[in-house]
């Protein structure tokens, strides 16, 4: 058996049916996975669905159904599409699965245990983009929209925060030491420029929505959808389950294959969470 090779796609939102962008990403990942298998490598190929958050909650309400009903219906479409395209994934993770919830809670527990002041309670006001499920910096908002044209709304919430600002220097050092961490180089340059501006602490809970994983110790808050979603890459390997054989074998991921619109989440937020928890970082975000 050759080298281990763990490849992941981004997990896809279930607020609507799968589209050509989802298909493109999974086909590219499938080609890479098949190639590595033919080379004799020990490949693990993960894909899945992101089923929590405001976007899904609102889409379900618009249809007059529960979020899990909408999720189940759309997930069935994903399974049908990947079967039709003969996508050779080894696992399919849903963020509504119990194994995923366990992994998310374990990540938070490790952060709080290792770096107790990395998570704290505070108030935040800013321009919130429902489409991206994140706050948008003031200089990226024009006439009520972000730079990609998505509408934003002014939001004030008392939430739990992650001390992302602490990781500005460690992240920049990691990029310099690992110049292929983000590929292509143009995307790495964008990430470096973003981080060099200085990172602000990140809101990691929401009290305005109910559809998600409850934050430990704060029953009125659900965990921020991106902290929830990103953890799929380790929860699918059994992180937090007590059986870490697959995690120990395949982690860190060799390649996170993602769309250009979510590079920041994978190249900034995700490695910062992992640094805080004392876990190895993925080798590459493509």
Model-inferred region functions:
Residues 2-40, 46-47, 99-103, 152-286:
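Structured secondary-structure scaffolds
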Residues 2-7, 50, 73, 77-80:
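Short, composition-biased local secondary-structure segments
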Residues 31, 55, 77, 106-107, ...:
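Short Gly/charged-rich anion-binding patches and loops
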Residues 39-42, 85-90, 116-119, 275-281:
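Surface-exposed helix-capping loop/turn segments at secondary-structure junctions
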Residues 49-55:
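Short, charge-patterned binding micro-sites
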Residues 56-62:
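Surface-exposed, active-site-proximal loop segments in enzymatic domains
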Residues 63-215:
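Residue patterns forming the tRNA-binding/recognition surfaces of aminoacyl-tRNA synthetases
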């Amino acid at each position: 058996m050759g080298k281990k090779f763990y490849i992941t796609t981004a997990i896809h939102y279930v607020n609507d049916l799968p589209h050509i962008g989802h298909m493109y990403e999974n086909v590219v990942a499938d080609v890479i996975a098949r190639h590595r298998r033919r080379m004799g490598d020990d490949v693990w190929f993960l894909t899945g669905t992101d089923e929590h958050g405001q976007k899904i909650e609102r889409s379900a309400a618009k249809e007059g159904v529960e979020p899990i009903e909408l999720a189940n219906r759309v997930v069935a479409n994903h399974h049908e599409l990947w079967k039709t395209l003969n996508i050779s994934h080894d696992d399919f993770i849903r963020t509504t699965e119990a194994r995923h919830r366990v992994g998310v809670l374990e990540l938070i527990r490790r952060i709080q245990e290792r770096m107790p002041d990395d998570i704290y309670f505070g108030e935040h006001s800013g321009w919130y983009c429902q489409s991206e499920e994140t706050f948008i910096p003031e200089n990226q908002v024009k006439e009520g929209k972000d730079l990609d044209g998505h509408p934003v709304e002014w939001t004030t919430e008392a939430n739990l925060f992650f001390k992302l600002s602490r990781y500005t220097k460690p992240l920049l050092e990691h990029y310099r030491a690992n110049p292929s961490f983000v590929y292509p180089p143009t995307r790495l340059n964008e990430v470096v420029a973003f981080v060099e501006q200085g990172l602000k602490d990140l809101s990691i809970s929401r009290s305005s929505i109910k559809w998600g994983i409850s934050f430990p110790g704060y029953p009125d808050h659900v965990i921020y959808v991106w902290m929830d979603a990103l953890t799929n890459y380790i929860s699918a390997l059994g992180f937090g389950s007590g059986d870490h054989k697959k995690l120990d074998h395949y982690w860190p991921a060799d390649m996170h294959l993602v769309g250009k619109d979510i590079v920041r989440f994978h190249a900034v937020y995700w490695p910062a969470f992992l640094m805080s928890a004392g876990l190895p970082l993925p080798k590459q975000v493509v």
